Design a protein with these regions (language model features):
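Alpha-helical transmembrane bundles and membrane-interface segments of multipass inner-membrane proteins
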Residues: 1-131
Length: 131
């Protein structure tokens, strides 16, 4: 990942790789289990949408990001051989000289949705117990 202009690593590149595992290739020996887990997660979000308070607009966005990311990676697993997702976003962090693991847009959606959900959980007065 070297920029042709100045010989320095580029901040962002697109690199095609496939990944049978989850984030950072975790559980790459169990792609079928990840497919089942993703299916279960999508079905659970749909079945428990009332309990998840999905009538609230911000939570619709959050679970839209999470569900869309899960669906995107699940689509790759179901329709690509052999049960792998395509990752292509390659980010280099020059300040700490770190080449972040390659990921995709679905991974980003899941991550952003989960972070926003945690922030809501810690800051939303509806989630705080009544004294």
């Amino acid at each position: 990942m070297i920029d042709a202009l100045d010989g320095q690593p580029a901040f962002l590149e697109f690199t095609y790789v496939t990944n049978p595992g989850a984030a950072w290739s975790l559980f790459s020996d169990y792609p079928e289990a990840l497919t089942l887990l993703a299916s279960f997660a999508l079905i659970s979000i749909f079945l428990f949408r009332k309990q998840l308070e999905l009538e609230r607009h911000v939570l619709q966005i959050v679970f839209g990001l999470i569900g869309g990311g899960i669906a995107g990676n699940l689509g790759d697993r179901l329709f690509r051989e052999p049960d792998e997702v395509v990752d292509f976003i390659d980010v280099y962090l020059p300040l700490i000289n770190y080449d972040y693991p390659i990921f995709n847009i679905a991974d980003s959606a899941i991550f952003i949705g989960a972070i926003v959900y945690l922030i809501i959980g810690f800051t939303d007065p509806k989630t705080k117990p009544n004294p």
